[in-house]
């Protein structure tokens, strides 16, 4: 990358914590190199306490865009000038575009599109399917929206934090009004309802942080009877590549287990196009993810 850097190099950033595990710098910098673009992508360790200063830095330095990850996806909303319709509906942002570097910041959400493209890549269709989704943070809400827009029959949401239930219920109400998908919300503490939902589902999606450090030894599913030969299990965590949930599901005969690498690739590709205005060469980038 040092050979490409010049006085004209444009910067794209990632604002998150922790960031050491992130694949985004590798993906985006390789894409810039493949396309011959004079851009550089850097990750910055930024939590909610530093977020306002970091966003002002995007404006002041003319940074062309930024990806946003935990814990900043919702906290960044009041710091932006505009939101895309999807980001406004979800109430979270993972991509910020600074058009022409002029300081007008627009927030977008690409997690849902990325997740559904990753599932399609594995031959998994959500149309007319019953899906249980655990975790309704920024990524989980984005996935729920995309599942409804793509024609899922039912989306059964379960949340770990009771404090989120009321705010997420507003999204549930909107999705039930805007789409034909039946969307429900329950507390993950209700294990009876959770297990019943999985038993009736074609696809289980874990959009929580369970499975990644420091929770790498935990799994939301521990009952072998919940794993069926016709159940697909998708964990959006990608580090480790096989979470305890995915290992458990594979060992007990799930139809398919899918980690978060594909979602990272495709949400990144969507973000790349929003910021750069060109398609990411995903076929060239995809093999790099297997190196991690």
Curated annotation (Swiss-Prot):
<feature type="binding site">
    <location>
        <position position="94"/>
    </location>
    <ligand>
        <name>shikimate</name>
    </ligand>
</feature>
<keyword id="KW-0560">Oxidoreductase</keyword>
<dbReference type="InterPro" id="IPR041121">
    <property type="entry name" value="SDH_C"/>
</dbReference>
<comment type="subunit">
    <text>Homodimer.</text>
</comment>
<dbReference type="GO" id="GO:0009073">
    <property type="term" value="P:aromatic amino acid family biosynthetic process"/>
</dbReference>
<dbReference type="GO" id="GO:0050661">
    <property type="term" value="F:NADP binding"/>
</dbReference>
<comment type="function">
    <text>Involved in the biosynthesis of the chorismate, which leads to the biosynthesis of aromatic amino acids. Catalyzes the reversible NADPH linked reduction of 3-dehydroshikimate (DHSA) to yield shikimate (SA).</text>
</comment>
<feature type="binding site">
    <location>
        <position position="238"/>
    </location>
    <ligand>
        <name>shikimate</name>
    </ligand>
</feature>
<protein>
    <recommendedName>
        <fullName>Shikimate dehydrogenase (NADP(+))</fullName>
        <ecNumber>1.1.1.25</ecNumber>
    </recommendedName>
</protein>
<dbReference type="GO" id="GO:0004764">
    <property type="term" value="F:shikimate 3-dehydrogenase (NADP+) activity"/>
</dbReference>
<dbReference type="Pfam" id="PF18317">
    <property type="entry name" value="SDH_C"/>
</dbReference>
<comment type="pathway">
    <text>Metabolic intermediate biosynthesis; chorismate biosynthesis; chorismate from D-erythrose 4-phosphate and phosphoenolpyruvate: step 4/7.</text>
</comment>
<keyword id="KW-0028">Amino-acid biosynthesis</keyword>
<keyword id="KW-0057">Aromatic amino acid biosynthesis</keyword>
<feature type="binding site">
    <location>
        <position position="69"/>
    </location>
    <ligand>
        <name>shikimate</name>
    </ligand>
</feature>
<dbReference type="GO" id="GO:0019632">
    <property type="term" value="P:shikimate metabolic process"/>
</dbReference>
<dbReference type="Pfam" id="PF08501">
    <property type="entry name" value="Shikimate_dh_N"/>
</dbReference>
<dbReference type="GO" id="GO:0008652">
    <property type="term" value="P:amino acid biosynthetic process"/>
</dbReference>
<dbReference type="InterPro" id="IPR036291">
    <property type="entry name" value="NAD(P)-bd_dom_sf"/>
</dbReference>
<feature type="binding site">
    <location>
        <position position="111"/>
    </location>
    <ligand>
        <name>shikimate</name>
    </ligand>
</feature>
<keyword id="KW-0521">NADP</keyword>
<dbReference type="GO" id="GO:0009423">
    <property type="term" value="P:chorismate biosynthetic process"/>
</dbReference>
<feature type="binding site">
    <location>
        <begin position="22"/>
        <end position="24"/>
    </location>
    <ligand>
        <name>shikimate</name>
    </ligand>
</feature>
<dbReference type="InterPro" id="IPR046346">
    <property type="entry name" value="Aminoacid_DH-like_N_sf"/>
</dbReference>
<feature type="binding site">
    <location>
        <position position="260"/>
    </location>
    <ligand>
        <name>NADP(+)</name>
    </ligand>
</feature>
<feature type="binding site">
    <location>
        <begin position="135"/>
        <end position="139"/>
    </location>
    <ligand>
        <name>NADP(+)</name>
    </ligand>
</feature>
<comment type="similarity">
    <text>Belongs to the shikimate dehydrogenase family.</text>
</comment>
<dbReference type="InterPro" id="IPR013708">
    <property type="entry name" value="Shikimate_DH-bd_N"/>
</dbReference>
<feature type="active site" description="Proton acceptor">
    <location>
        <position position="73"/>
    </location>
</feature>
<dbReference type="InterPro" id="IPR011342">
    <property type="entry name" value="Shikimate_DH"/>
</dbReference>
<dbReference type="InterPro" id="IPR022893">
    <property type="entry name" value="Shikimate_DH_fam"/>
</dbReference>
<feature type="binding site">
    <location>
        <position position="236"/>
    </location>
    <ligand>
        <name>NADP(+)</name>
    </ligand>
</feature>
């Amino acid at each position: 990358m040092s050979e490409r850097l010049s006085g004209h190099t444009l910067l794209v950033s990632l604002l998150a914590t922790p960031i050491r595990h992130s694949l985004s710098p590798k993906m985006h910098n390789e894409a810039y190199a493949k396309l011959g673009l004079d851009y550089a992508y850097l990750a910055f360790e930024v939590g909610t306490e530093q977020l306002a200063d970091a966003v002002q830095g995007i404006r002041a330095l003319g940074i062309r865009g930024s990806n946003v990850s935990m814990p900043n996806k919702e906290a960044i909303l009041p710091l932006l000038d505009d939101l895309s319709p999807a980001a406004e509906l979800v109430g979270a942002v993972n991509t910020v575009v600074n058009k022409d570097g002029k300081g007008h910041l627009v927030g977008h959400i690409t997690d849902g599109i990325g997740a559904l493209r990753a599932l399609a890549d594995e031959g998994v269709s959500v149309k007319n399917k019953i899906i249980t989704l655990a975790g309704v943070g920024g990524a989980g809400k984005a996935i729920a929206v995309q599942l409804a827009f793509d024609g899922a029959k039912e989306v059964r949401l379960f949340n770990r934090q009771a404090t989120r239930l009321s705010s997420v219920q507003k999204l549930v109400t909107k999705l039930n009004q805007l789409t034909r998908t039946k969307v429900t919300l329950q507390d993950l503490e209700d294990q009876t309802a959770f297990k019943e939902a999985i038993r009736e589902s074609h696809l289980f999606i874990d959009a929580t942080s369970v499975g990644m450090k420091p929770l790498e030894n935990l799994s939301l599913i521990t009952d072998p009877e919940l794993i069926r030969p016709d159940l697909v299990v998708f964990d959006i965590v990608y580090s480790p590549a096989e979470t305890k949930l995915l290992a458990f599901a594979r060992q007990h005969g799930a139809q398919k287990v899918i980690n978060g690498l594909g979602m990272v690739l495709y949400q990144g590709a969507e973000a790349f196009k929003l910021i750069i205005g060109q398609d990411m060469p995903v076929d060239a980038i995809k093999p790099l993810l297997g190196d991690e």
